[in-house]
A protein has these predicted regions:
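Start-transfer (signal-anchor) and selected internal transmembrane alpha helices
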Residues: 1-25, 29-30, 34-85, 342-348, ...
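Interfacial juxtamembrane loops and adjacent helix segments
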Residues: 113-229
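Membrane-interface alpha helices of multi-pass inner-membrane proteins
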Residues: 269-271, 300-316, 320-327, 350
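Short acidic/glycine- and proline-prone juxtamembrane loop motifs at membrane-interface regions
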Residues: 273-280
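Transmembrane-helix signature of polytopic, membrane-embedded enzymes
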Residues: 13-17, 71, 223-226, 245-265
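Transmembrane helical bundles and short interhelical boundary loops of multi-pass, membrane-embedded
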Residues: 23-50, 353-372, 518-557
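Membrane-lumen/periplasm interface segments of multi-pass, membrane-embedded glycan/lipid transferases
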Residues: 359-446, 554
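Perimembrane helix-loop-helix junctions
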Residues: 290-299, 321-352
Length: 557
C-alpha cells in the first residue's frame, strides 16, 4: 500500500527532501564531469560537494520562504531577490547588454561625480576589470576558420559563435570565462599598465542611483572594482525586488502572470545587473499591476503617475504611451482626487518635463566630449529613415514582420543572454511554455463572483502592448538602423517583457472561456511561485554552466 507523503511527519518529509537534494547534486555533478570533461579542470570532489551543497542551500532557502514569508507578495518578493542573487553572480562581469558603459557611469556617480567629463579617467583597477572582461565576451572570443579533422583527415570549417568555452585539439586547455577572472585577479603582479579608461557616452544620473549606492557601500567595505560591480548589482536587484513586491501587493487579479514574468530568467538577468532596465522593468510591472485594481484612489493614481514619469527618464518619448491607460479606468471606478484627464495631463506634463530636463542636464554638464557620432555610423539618419518609412509603408511593414520572424518573434529568445551572444537552447524552448503555464494559472476561478478586470481594462492593456511593441520597433528602425535596411537593428527580447505581461491577462480570459480550468485562484497562486522559482534557479545554473562548465567547442586548427 503506497505511503502518502502528506501523512508523514514534517521532519521525515524534510529529511527525505535533504536526501533527494544531495542525490540530485551528486548526479548533476556526475553529468558535468562526464559530458563536459570537467575532471580535467576541477577536482571531482570539489564539483560533487559544490553541487550537493548548492542544492541543500536552495532547499534551506525554500524552507525559510515557506516557513517565514507570509502572503503571496512577500513570498514572491523573497523568491525574486534570492533567485536574482544567483543571476548576479552566475552572470560574469559586464556581460549584460551595455553593462560596461553602465558600470562606468554608475562608478562615477558613486564617487560623487554627477557631471560628465570625457577627460576624467578611472582608477587602474577599473581599467584592469574592463580589459579582462570585454563586453560581448563570447563574441570577442569567437574564432572561425578551417581546420583538419584528426579522425578523418578532412578539412572542416569551425565557428565558435555562441560558445563561451573552446578547446584547441582534444588535449588542449579549455579556454573559458575563468581565464578572465584569473587575468583580473593577477593584475597586482603584472608589469604592464592598462590603457586609461575615460567616461562613457552616457548622460543619465537618476536611473543609475541604486547601483551607485551599492558601489559606494562596497567601496566603504574595502572592495575593489570587481566588488563594486557586485555591490551595484545587488542594490539594483533590491530596487527591482521592491518594485515587484509593490506590484504583487497592489495587483488584485492575474497575480500568477505577474509572478511568472518577474521570475523569468530574462527578467532576473536584467534585474540583477547594472542596467537601468532593473528599475525600468519594475515600473512597467507595477503600472500593469495597478490596472488590475477595481477602484483607483489618490494613492493608486499617484503611484501610477510616479512610475510613468520615471520610465520616461530612462526611455523618453515612447514611454509617453503609458499615460493613456489612465483612461482605461472607468469613471465609476475612479475615486482619486481630481478627474482622469487632469491626472493624464499631469502625467504627460511631468514625463515631458523630466525628459527635457534630462536632455538639458546631459548637455549643460557635459565637458570635453568630442563630436558624438550616431550609433551605427553615417549610414544611420533618423530624418532620412523616417521619410523613407513614410514613402514606403508596405516595405516597412515587410521589414518589421521579417525582423520578428527572424528572431522567433522574440518570445523564442527568452534564453538569449550576454550581449545577445550566448543562447541557452533549453530556456529558449521552455520560456514560451512558462508563459503559457502562467496564463493557465491566471485563468483560475476568481475569488469573487463579479468578473474583473473588465474587457475594457484587459483589452486596453493588450492593445497598449501591441502599440508599444510597434513603437519600440519603429524607434529602433528610425534611430539605429541604416536607411533602407530590410531588418531592424538592435531589438532584444528584454524590450518585450512588459508586452508579454500585458498580453497574458487577455490570453487568460480566452483560456478561461475555452477550457474552463477547475483550479481555484488560491491554489494557482500557491503553485506559481515555487514552480517559477525552481525554473529561475535552473536558469541561473544553466547560465553559470554555459560560461564556466560547458558545452565546449573543440577546434581542430
Amino acid at each position: 500500500m503506497p505511503i502518502k507523503l502528506q501523512k508523514l511527519p514534517a521532519a521525515v518529509r524534510w529529511g527525505l527532501a535533504v536526501l533527494c537534494a544531495a542525490v540530485c547534486g551528486v548526479l548533476w555533478a556526475y553529468y558535468w564531469r562526464v559530458f563536459f570533461g570537467l575532471d580535467n579542470r576541477v577536482s571531482p570532489l570539489v564539483v560533487t560537494l559544490g553541487c550537493a551543497a548548492f542544492l541543500e542551500v536552495c532547499l534551506l532557502a525554500g524552507y525559510c520562504v515557506r516557513r517565514f514569508a507570509k502572503g503571496f507578495a512577500a513570498k514572491g518578493a523573497v523568491c525574486i531577490f534570492l533567485c536574482g542573487l544567483l543571476f548576479a553572480f552566475a552572470n560574469p562581469p559586464l556581460q549584460t547588454p551595455d553593462e560596461a558603459d553602465h558600470y562606468l557611469r554608475t562608478y562615477a556617480i558613486s564617487t560623487g561625480h554627477f557631471d560628465f567629463d570625457a577627460s576624467r579617467t578611472y582608477p587602474d583597477d577599473v581599467a584592469y576589470l574592463l580589459e579582462a572582461f570585454p563586453g560581448a565576451w563570447v563574441n570577442a572570443h569567437t574564432s572561425a576558420g578551417v581546420g583538419t579533422d584528426p579522425d578523418t583527415g578532412a578539412e572542416k570549417a569551425y565557428n565558435t559563435a555562441g560558445y563561451a568555452l573552446k578547446q584547441y585539439g582534444k588535449e588542449g586547455a579549455v579556454q573559458s570565462m575563468a581565464d578572465s577572472f584569473a587575468l583580473y585577479l593577477a593584475h597586482d603582479v603584472r608589469d604592464s599598465v592598462p590603457d586609461p579608461v575615460s567616461e562613457p557616452v552616457s548622460f543619465l544620473v537618476i536611473p543609475f542611483l541604486p547601483g551607485a549606492v551599492g558601489m559606494a557601500l562596497a567601496r566603504l567595505l574595502g572592495f575593489g572594482a570587481l566588488g563594486c560591480l557586485y555591490g551595484g548589482r545587488i542594490v539594483n536587484l533590491l530596487a527591482y525586488t521592491l518594485l515587484c513586491a509593490l506590484a504583487l501587493a497592489k495587483a488584485e487579479r492575474y497575480r500568477p502572470a505577474f509572478a511568472a514574468i518577474m521570475l523569468l530568467p530574462m527578467s532576473l538577468f536584467m534585474g540583477a545587473s547594472l542596467s537601468y532596465d532593473a528599475t525600468l522593468l519594475g515600473c512597467y510591472y507595477l503600472m500593469l499591476a495597478l490596472l488590475t485594481r477595481k477602484e483607483w484612489n489618490t494613492q493608486t493614481a499617484g503611484i501610477y503617475t510616479a512610475a510613468c514619469i520615471f520610465v520616461n527618464i530612462a526611455k523618453p518619448y515612447l514611454n509617453l504611451l503609458w499615460v493613456l491607460p489612465i483612461f482605461l479606468v472607468a469613471k465609476r471606478e475612479w475615486y482619486a482626487k481630481g478627474c482622469r484627464p487632469l491626472w493624464a495631463l499631469g502625467g504627460f506634463g511631468g514625463a515631458m518635463a523630466v525628459t527635457l530636463l534630462t536632455e538639458w542636464y546631459g548637455t549643460a554638464f557635459r565637458y570635453n566630449y568630442p563630436m558624438i557620432e550616431r550609433q551605427g555610423g553615417s549610414t544611420v539618419n533618423g530624418g532620412e529613415q523616417l521619410a523613407f518609412v513614410l514613402r514606403n509603408p508596405l516595405r516597412t511593414i515587410a521589414a518589421f514582420w521579417g525582423t520578428l520572424g527572424e528572431n522567433d518573434f522574440f518570445i523564442g529568445q527568452l534564453g538569449l543572454f550576454g550581449w545577445k551572444d550566448l543562447p541557452i537552447s533549453f530556456l529558449n524552448l521552455t520560456g514560451p511554455l512558462v508563459l503559457l503555464l502562467a496564463a493557465l494559472l491566471a485563468a483560475a476561478q476568481p475569488k469573487r463572483a463579479d468578473a474583473f478586470p473588465t474587457r475594457r481594462r484587459v483589452g486596453g492593456a493588450a492593445l497598449l502592448a501591441l502599440v508599444y511593441a510597434a513603437g519600440a520597433m519603429a524607434a529602433m528602425y528610425i534611430t539605429y538602423t541604416p536607411v533602407g535596411m530590410v531588418r531592424i537593428v538592435g531589438l532584444q527580447a528584454r524590450y518585450f517583457l512588459c508586452v508579454w505581461l500585458a498580453l497574458l491577462p487577455a490570453l487568460a480570459v480566452l483560456l478561461r472561456k475555452t477550457i474552463r480550468p477547475a483550479i481555484t485562484e488560491e491554489k494557482a497562486e500557491a503553485a506559481i511561485t515555487p514552480l517559477c522559482a525552481c525554473y529561475a534557479v535552473f536558469g541561473a545554473v544553466l547560465l553559470f554552466q554555459h560560461y564556466f562548465v560547458g558545452p565546449v567547442y573543440v577546434v581542430y586548427a
